[in-house]
From Swiss-Prot:
GO terms for molecular function: zinc ion binding. This is Protein SprT-like. It is found in: Cytoplasm. The keyword Cytoplasm applies. The active site is at E68. Keywords: Cytoplasm, Metal-binding, Zinc. GO terms for biological process: response to stress.
Length: 155
């Protein structure tokens, strides 16, 4: 999905669920990490996280769109648009939008190092120069044996 398709989807979702037009811009923002989208109060634009579309699919992504459109329409109507406001919670229930997003699994590269002398192995996230460091147990030389990707739930 590109920016134009996102804009079209946002306008369609707004008309279908809120019976109101979406008159501002919807854009992808890949820098968003722990949030599915955000409504910008000053410009009234909505930024969406493309990783949620990739990881969870279009149906879940439309739920996030509905959540952001709740902020959008309530703010323009000068009603309570924040998560704690009663107007916001009622509109979320009415349009069946999620209150929170699921976390995206994060990809971490783990590097395995092994001691040549004692055979002890350990994992590190950051690589290091094996010529500058020694084994903490026996003082032997270290070698990098493996690098693997691990997916975690925490952001």
């Amino acid at each position: 999905m590109n920016q134009a398709e996102l804009q079209r989807h946002m306008e369609e979702v707004s008309l279908q669920f809120f019976q109101k037009e979406f008159r501002h811009q919807a854009v992808f923002n890949a820098r968003l990490r722990t949030t599915g989208g955000r409504y910008l109060l000053k410009s009234h634009n909505i930024e969406m996280n493309p990783k949620y579309l990739e990881n969870f699919g279009l149906a879940y992504f439309i739920g996030i769109m509905k959540h952001e459109l709740c902020h959008y329409h309530l703010h323009l109507e000068k009603k309570g648009y924040q998560h704690r406001d009663q107007d916001f919670r009622e509109l979320l229930k009415k349009v069946d939008a999620p209150r929170f997003c699921a976390t995206i699994p994060r990809e971490i590269t783990m590097h395995e190092y092994t001691c040549k002398s004692c055979g002890k192995s350990f994992l590190r996230q950051r690589r290091f120069n094996v010529n500058r460091y020694r084994c903490g147990s026996c003082g032997g030389k270290l070698i990098q044996t493996d690098s693997k990707k691990i997916y975690t739930e925490n952001p």
